[in-house]
A protein has these predicted regions:
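Amphipathic alpha-helical repeat scaffolds
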Residues: 36, 56-60
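A short, hydrophobic beta-strand/beta-hairpin element that forms part of a small beta-sheet core
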Residues: 146-148
Length: 148
């Protein structure tokens, strides 16, 4: 069963629905780039027209089993335009200590993850990946992750 916190993150992070543009100088979700877990640049503009579920994850978290739910959602809805993007972070209790290679191996071996995963990033605070800073500035503090 998908837990309550997982649904909270879905509601908070599915900001691609809002793709609002307040002026020509305002960024949107699709203006960002992020490194994949393989070290390649992932240009989010390639997902225009899709619904994006951006979720921070960790391999040693009590919610690690959410990978099963994320993969199921991705499998069920990818043909309808849903893209799940997992962003590993070590900011919550040191629960993602591994390298990108270790994280990728863990996800593929234990959960058969096929949705895009990124490099490990900070998701809150001054050193957060710019997409998280943008989300906070654009949609408010409620978009700042509180846990994995």
């Amino acid at each position: 069963m998908i837990n309550k916190n997982f649904f909270i993150y879905i509601v908070i992070i599915m900001f691609s629905f809002f793709n609002k543009t307040m002026s020509d100088n305002t960024k949107t979700f699709f203006d960002f780039k992020i490194n994949s877990i393989n070290g390649e640049e992932l240009d989010l503009s390639s997902f225009k027209g899709k619904t994006i579920l951006l979720v921070n994850v960790a391999s040693k978290c009590g919610f690690t089993n959410q990978y099963d739910d994320l993969q199921k959602i991705y499998d069920d809805l990818k043909d309808k335009g849903l893209i799940v993007i997992g962003i590993p972070t070590n900011q919550f209790g040191g629960q993602e200590p591994g390298s990108e290679k270790e994280i990728k191996n863990f996800c593929e071996t234990n959960f058969n993850i096929t949705f895009p995963m990124t490099s490990k990033y900070e998701v809150k605070g001054a050193n957060a990946h710019p997409i998280y800073i943008w989300a906070k500035d654009t949609f408010g503090k409620s978009t700042v992750p509180k846990w994995n």
